């Protein structure tokens, strides 16, 4: 039947299909160009630099990989971070991004294209955004056809949520992980539709690449088992479902265990237990279906009872083992981030270091409109379209959007996972809507032309001569008997052929809308798309393209560039010893190591809460106690970020309460209430003495009153409480041009002792001189 339905070569249908395929390829190429080019605003407006904080660590690791090779990379012990502990890089990093960029750099240099490692890192994310758009097309095409796929790919190429993590210079794990996520889902749906073991193997390999790239791979290994369980419960089990799932669990788990940062966690942590439980269930169901096919109904009932009994015993044993493993862990076998997703209040109660990260906070309603814009209104229509008709593939994308909406509501970072699902649903909705509206317009225009033709035919027949009519009557009279008998037979033959066409016409007419309504709706959809494009271009150009290391401000005098961070790191690099240790809050650890090449105490990896709490305690303590803590860590310089002069809100004073909370979680003498006045965080004259005497306050506001004579903080919009004070244990060595970064050096203990000795000596000498003056007879 399939061969009969396929159009013959050279026919209009075949030509139309060939033209459609060529046009689809051309559109996909343009979508890839759009996805790449819309992410280049940061390079055009600023320069080719790495953005944010985490990308600097990835850039540094890629530099090491390209210089020393993969074997040195796996065994690299980095003594520049987490002093004096250090860090084993090969076993604590997701290597997918680094290996991808390193391979691209090696391939280009092999072809005599001498690009620097930094250039490759800057443009990796825009390139993979094009790949992600094409993967979205493939996934949506498997669900609802090529029209929906093209629409979804175009939407993903521009969606602001994805742009925020894939602009040029955003060299983070999500740059390649979102492509891996979508491609893994596509191969799962492809295997589900075809039942091909080849695609199942590719699916396991794509999952392995996702595991290498990002810790968010646990979303895949939980979402797919949920879909398999949904299909089993709703009676949609098939051999294709088994082929799509079983190889993924077996091969995927084995491959995931090869990644050093995952290792045995692939089988020992609670995030993976759902996949193993569903793996057992699908085998029990497959066994039941197999037995049903080879046994009689009576024997089948007996066999089912036996299989279910054995299956329940096995499940009980497995559940008991899992419960024992979970009970042996203080967190129930879950990681802190996973627990914060299941219980949104968990991090704020027990792990403040996780809650202190801005991207781990729940999003606000405006952020949904900012990040997915009009897609939020199209998603419900896409969900409805997936239910008509409901298939295994469409049920998967519905489950995907539901779960991603929940997780994005818990953690703003996971808006990135929601973006592809929203684009897929919106693409399906737009495709269905355009099909209905354009079909209605075509039908209405065709019906109007047919009615005019029928009217012309009727007028011509009415004007026919009467003699011809009478002659026709006599001829017909002779053949009446023959025609009646033949018509009876023809009626019976035509009836079954006519009935389906009538039903099809009725069905078509149910989807036909009035011409005016279709045109208006089509114009509204085009306007909605134009509004979406304008918003996405604005978000790419203004909101998400500014690198955090270089800031700009627009005023009446023109554009002001604040390059204080690079200025400070350059000063550290040129004016300090290579082995000097720099203490700062963990946000700036990666940048300090990568740009200044100096050893830091803590960085953005945040793997050791006690070490971070030690730095937080030092910042929260009085100057003398802080000096003792830093001196015990062999710290030479302290870096503080301050925005009170220019109005930079992401400074250390605004982060200070998190330092207090994290420090107080390990060292009980640090209490948040001591830094608050009537429950309010203040730095003015009403601030508490503990706050005014803390090291963070002193290092931020030292000599600040000299800038305007009042000490007015533009971020907190108030005058500071303690304006005139001196530092006894620290000395200022560098303050950037706009006072954004301030560097202080710890005074050596012998200098301070000598200073005290000099004071004592001067006092004694002055006392002796006064006494001798009294005894001097010449005075």
Curated annotation (Swiss-Prot):
Q: Which GO terms describe its biological process?
A: protein glycosylation; regulation of response to osmotic stress; response to salt stress
* Positions annotated to bind Mn(2+): 54, 172, 174
Highest taxon, organism lineage: Eukaryota
The UniProt keywords, alphabetically, are: Endoplasmic reticulum, Glycoprotein, Glycosyltransferase, Magnesium, Manganese, Membrane, Metal-binding, Transferase, Transmembrane, Transmembrane helix
Report motif location: SVSE motif: 356-359
Tissue expr? Expressed in the root and in the shoot.
Catalysed reactions, as listed in the record: a di-trans,poly-cis-dolichyl diphosphooligosaccharide + L-asparaginyl-[protein] = N(4)-(oligosaccharide-(1->4)-N-acetyl-beta-D-glucosaminyl-(1->4)-N-acetyl-beta-D-glucosaminyl)-L-asparaginyl-[protein] + a di-trans,poly-cis-dolichyl diphosphate + H(+)
User: Record's InterPro entries?
Assistant: Oligo_trans_STT3, STT3-PglB_core, STT3_N
Q: Give residue numbers for sequence motif WWDYG motif.
A: 585-589
Residue ranges, Cytoplasmic compartment?
Answer: 1-17, 144-145, 195-196, 234-238, 293-305, 388-393, 437-518
Q: Where is this site: Important for catalytic activity?
A: 165
| Residues the entry annotates as binding dolichyl diphosphooligosaccharide | 413, 590
Task: Return the Polar residues bias intervals.
Answer: 448-464
List the cofactors: Mg(2+); Mn(2+)
Bias class Basic and acidic residues marks the residues at 465-501
List where in the cell it is found. Endoplasmic reticulum membrane
The residue numbers the entry assigns to motif DXD motif 1 are: 52-54
The residue range of the signal peptide is none
- An example Gene Ontology cellular component term from the record? endoplasmic reticulum membrane
Tell me which residues are marked as the site Interacts with target acceptor peptide in protein substrate.
54, 359, 655
* Glycan attachment sites: 597, 604, 608
Q: Give the record's subunit note.
A: Component of the oligosaccharyltransferase (OST) complex.
| Free-text function comment from the UniProt entry | Catalytic subunit of the oligosaccharyl transferase (OST) complex that catalyzes the initial transfer of a defined glycan (Glc(3)Man(9)GlcNAc(2) in eukaryotes) from the lipid carrier dolichol-pyrophosphate to an asparagine residue within an Asn-X-Ser/Thr consensus motif in nascent polypeptide chains, the first step in protein N-glycosylation. N-glycosylation occurs cotranslationally and the complex associates with the Sec61 complex at the channel-forming translocon complex that mediates protein translocation across the endoplasmic reticulum (ER).
**Which family does the similarity line name?**
Belongs to the STT3 family.
Q: What is this protein called?
A: Dolichyl-diphosphooligosaccharide--protein glycosyltransferase subunit STT3A
């Amino acid at each position: 039947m399939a061969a009969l339905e396929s159009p013959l070569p050279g026919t209009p249908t075949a030509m139309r299909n060939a033209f459609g395929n060529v046009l689809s390829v051309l559109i996909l190429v343009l979508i890839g160009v759009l996805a790449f080019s819309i992410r280049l605003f940061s390079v055009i407006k600023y320069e080719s630099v790495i953005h944010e904080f985490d990308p600097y660590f990835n850039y540094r690791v890629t530099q090491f990989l390209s210089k020393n090779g993969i074997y040195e990379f796996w065994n690299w012990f980095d003594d520049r971070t987490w002093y004096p502990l250090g860090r084993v890089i090969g076993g604590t990093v997701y290597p997918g991004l680094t290996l991808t960029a390193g391979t691209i750099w090696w391939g280009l240099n092999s072809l005599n294209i001498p690009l620097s490692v930094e250039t490759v890192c800057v443009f990796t994310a825009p390139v993979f955004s094009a790949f992600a758009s094409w993967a979205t097309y493939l996934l949506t095409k498997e669900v609802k056809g090529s029209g929906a796929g093209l629409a979804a790919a175009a939407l993903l190429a521009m969606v602001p949520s994805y742009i925020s993590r894939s602009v040029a210079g955003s060299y983070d794990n999500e740059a390649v992980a979102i492509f891996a996520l979508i491609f893994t889902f596509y191969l799962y749906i492809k295997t589900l539709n075809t039942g091909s073991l080849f695609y199942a193997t590719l699916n396991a390999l794509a999952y392995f690449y996702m595991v290498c790239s990002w810790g968010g791979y646990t979303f895949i290994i939980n979402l797919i088992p949920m879909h398999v369980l949904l299909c089993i419960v709703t009676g949609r089990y098939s051999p294709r479902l088994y082929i799509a799932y079983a190889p993924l669990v077996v091969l995927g788990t084995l491959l995931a265990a090869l990644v050093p940062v995952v290792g045995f966690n692939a089988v020992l942590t609670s995030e993976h237990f759902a996949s193993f439980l569903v793996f057992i269930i699908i085998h029990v169901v497959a066994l039941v279906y197999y037995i049903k096919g080879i046994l009689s109904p009576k024997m089948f009932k007996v066999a089912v009872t036996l299989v279910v009994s054995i299956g329940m015993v096995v499940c009980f044993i497995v559940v008991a083992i899992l419960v024992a493993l979970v009970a042996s862990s203080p967190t129930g076998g879950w990681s802190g981030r996973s627990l914060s997703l299941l219980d949104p209040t968990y991090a704020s109660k027990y792990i403040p270091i996780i809650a202190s990260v801005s991207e781990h906070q729940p999003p606000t309603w405006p952020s949904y409109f900012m990040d997915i814009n009009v897609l939020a209104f199209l998603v419900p229509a896409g969900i409805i379209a997936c239910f008509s008709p409901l298939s295994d593939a469409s049920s998967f994308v519905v489950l995907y959007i539901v779960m991603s909406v929940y997780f994005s509501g818990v953690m703003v970072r996971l808006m990135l996972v929601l973006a592809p699902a929203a684009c897929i649903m919106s693409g399906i909705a737009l495709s269905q809507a355009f099909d209905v509206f354009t079909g209605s317009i075509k039908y209405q225009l065709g019906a109007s032309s047919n009615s005019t033709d029928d009217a012309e035919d009727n007028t011509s027949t009415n004007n026919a001569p009467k003699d011809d009519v009478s002659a026709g009557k006599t001829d017909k009279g002779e053949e009446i008997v023959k025609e009646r008998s033949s018509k009876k037979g023809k009626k019976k033959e035509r009836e079954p052929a006519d009935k389906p066409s009538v039903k099809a016409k009725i069905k078509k007419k149910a989807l036909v809308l009035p011409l005016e309504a279709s045109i208006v709706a089509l114009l509204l959809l085009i306007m909605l798309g134009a509004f979406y494009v304008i918003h996405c271009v604005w978000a790419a150009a203004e909101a998400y393209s500014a690198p955090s290391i270089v800031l700009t401000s627009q005023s009446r005098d023109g554009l002001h560039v604040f390059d204080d961070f690079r200025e400070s790191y350059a000063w550290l690099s040129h004016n300090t010893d290579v082995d000097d240790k720099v203490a700062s809050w963990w946000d700036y650890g990666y940048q300090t190591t990568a740009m200044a090449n100096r050893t830091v105490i803590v960085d953005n990896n945040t793997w050791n809460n006690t070490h971070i709490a030690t730095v937080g305690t030092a910042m929260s303590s009085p100057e003398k106690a802080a000096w003792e803590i830093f001196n015990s860590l062999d710290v030479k310089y302290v870096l503080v970020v301050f925005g009170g002069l220019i109005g930079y809100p992401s400074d250390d004073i605004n982060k200070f309460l998190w330092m207090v909370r994290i420090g107080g979680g390990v060292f009980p003498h640090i209490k948040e209430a001591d830094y608050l006045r009537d429950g309010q965080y203040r730095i003015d004259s009403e601030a508490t003495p503990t706050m005014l005497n803390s090291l963070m306050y002193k290092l931020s506001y030292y000599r600040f009153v000299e800038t305007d004579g009042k000490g007015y903080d533009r971020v907190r919009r108030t005058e500071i409480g303690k304006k005139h004070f001196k530092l006894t244990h620290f000395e200022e060595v560098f303050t950037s041009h706009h006072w954004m970064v301030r560097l202080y050096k710890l005074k050596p203990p012998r200098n301070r002792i000598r200073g005290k000795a000099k004071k004592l000596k001067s006092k004694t000498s002055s006392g002796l001189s006064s006494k001798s003056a009294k005894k001097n007879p010449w005075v």
